[in-house]
């Protein structure tokens, strides 16, 4: 397993090209699995289920058509993007379980900072309750999304992956309806009052990976 960390901001098209090539090499038995930690410049990506109406400000940032699952999401500075090039075939050929493991991995990493991340039926990603915010219009406790998940598989090897909000400009999410969900907001570790660095998050991800996926 290679853990790859890239400083600075990585061009989106270049990242996709790397992932596609690496996934093909993994499927061919020519490369080891790879977890790639990086940040992108501000941009929006549209997953395979994206609705045009959910792109509310199409001129704000570059928009990329992504072949990952899911709807619209934002990437930008202060957000840890985690691209997972893993052999799902040798991990059981169970895509649903693999997505659950990605969610469990994020939840385990957040727990290192005493943040309780939760999953919700019908809402892929990881959520945190906001007791400090008013109830929703439906009278439910407010919840904000702290991490998004969207993957693609080719020959049973995954690519794309996870984005965790560490300290992004949350106003940048206002140009889309994130993941097609209007009732809930977005948050970050810093927004929750934690002085967490990207390096802290990387350590938490590395430490919690083996607990979820087994030894790398």
From Swiss-Prot:
It catalyses: octanoyl-[ACP] + L-lysyl-[protein] = N(6)-octanoyl-L-lysyl-[protein] + holo-[ACP] + H(+). Keywords: Acyltransferase, Cytoplasm, Transferase. Its EC number is 2.3.1.181. Gene3D superfamilies: Bira Bifunctional Protein, Domain 2. One of its GO terms (biological process) is protein modification process. Residues 29-216 form the BPL/LPL catalytic domain. It comes from the Bacteria. Pfam families: LplA-B_cat. Its main location: cytoplasm. The keyword Cytoplasm applies. The record marks 145 as: Lowers pKa of active site Cys. GO terms for cellular component: cytoplasm. Substrate binds at residues 68-75, 148-150, 161-163. It is found in: Cytoplasm. It is an enzyme of class 2 (transferase). Pathway: Protein modification; protein lipoylation via endogenous pathway; protein N(6)-(lipoyl)lysine from octanoyl-[acyl-carrier-protein]: step 1/2. GO terms for molecular function: lipoyl(octanoyl) transferase activity. The active site is at residue 179. In the reaction, the free carboxyl group of octanoic acid is attached via an amide linkage to the epsilon-amino group of a specific lysine residue of lipoyl domains of lipoate-dependent enzymes. Catalyzes the transfer of endogenously produced octanoic acid from octanoyl-acyl-carrier-protein onto the lipoyl domains of lipoate-dependent enzymes. Lipoyl-ACP can also act as a substrate although octanoyl-ACP is likely to be the physiological substrate. Belongs to the LipB family. HAMAP family: LipB (MF_00013). This is Octanoyltransferase. The gene is lipB.
């Amino acid at each position: 397993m290679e853990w790859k960390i890239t400083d600075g901001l990585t061009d989106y098209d270049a990242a996709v090209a790397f992932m596609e090539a690496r996934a093909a090499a993994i499927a061919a038995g020519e490369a080891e699995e790879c977890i790639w930690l990086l940040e992108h410049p501000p941009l929006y990506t549209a997953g395979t289920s994206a609705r045009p109406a959910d792109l509310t400000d199409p001129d704000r940032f570059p928009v990329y058509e992504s072949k990952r699952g899911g709807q619209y999401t934002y990437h930008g500075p202060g957000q840890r993007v985690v691209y997972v090039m893993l052999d799902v075939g040798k991990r059981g050929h169970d895509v649903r379980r693999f997505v659950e493991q990605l969610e469990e991995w994020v939840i385990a990493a957040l727990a290192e900072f005493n943040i309780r991340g939760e999953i919700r039926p019908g809402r892929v990603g990881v959520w945190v309750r906001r007791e400090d915010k008013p109830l929703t219009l439906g009278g439910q406790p407010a919840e904000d999304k702290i991490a998004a998940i969207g993957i693609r598989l080719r020959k049973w090897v995954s690519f794309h992956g996870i984005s965790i909000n560490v300290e992004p400009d949350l106003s940048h999410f206002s140009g889309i309806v994130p993941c097609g969900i209007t009732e809930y907001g977005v948050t970050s570790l810093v927004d929750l009052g934690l002085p967490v660095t990207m390096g802290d998050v990387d350590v938490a991800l590395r430490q919690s990976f083996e607990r979820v996926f087994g030894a790398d």
